[in-house]
Amino acid sequence: MVYATRTITHGTENVAMSGGTGGTATRIQSTGVAKFNPSIDQDSKDVKADARTHMTLQNPKKLTIEIDNYQYSDDEMLQMGFTKVNGGFVDSGSYAPFDIQRITTVDSEDGTKTKKLDVYFNATSGSYTESDDEDDDEINPKTYTRTLTVKGKDFGDGNGLVKQFTIVRTAKNATVFDTNESKILKPSDFKTGGA
């Protein structure tokens, strides 16, 4: 039996968002990300007939991301349904869609390290909840948690609705991969850079 090379993925860094879907808007860097937790939920339903299971139906996958931050930028406040008024924020209830990406580190059993990019398309954000830490005995930072719902985007390339794109940095795609520091990347960006 031959196993694949053993790897471990860890850390979350360089979390960034666009102001609109498709990676065409300005790249917004998120500061103070303490947790970035994608989760997929897919329910099934057994349909009974003739005293047995006739069929099992699968509901569509629901992709959400729970993010903990120690602070939010003005752009992130707008994503959560706030509008800036006179230097402060009011809850407008308008949730603009955006794309979000992050970098993780992949350690291999042979000692090599590389980066992995995860991009999520057409996300919307609910408002944040705030931790109730108090400074009784020691200083505890407030943690702000919000949940994103990822709806996906059709890029017109025959792949249908794309909710998530994941790629590991290689020597062949490094030039394109490294542009993640200046823009939100799409699968089509890697056509010329290779896999």
Language-model features: locations:
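Oligomerization/assembly interface segments of phage tail-like spikes and tubes
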Residues: 52-78, 140-154
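N-terminal "mature-chain" segments and other terminal, solvent-exposed stretches
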Residues: 39-50
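OB-fold ssDNA-binding interfaces and closely related basic DNA-contact patches used
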Residues: 31, 54, 79-83
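Short structured motifs
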Residues: 49-53, 131-134
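Short helix-loop boundary/capping segments
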Residues: 93-130, 134
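Charged, amphipathic alpha-helical segments
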Residues: 72-93
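Mixed-charge, glycine-accented linear interaction segment located at domain edges/termini
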Residues: 124-195
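Polar/acidic, low-complexity leader/linker segments enriched in S/T/G and N/D
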Residues: 1-37, 192-195
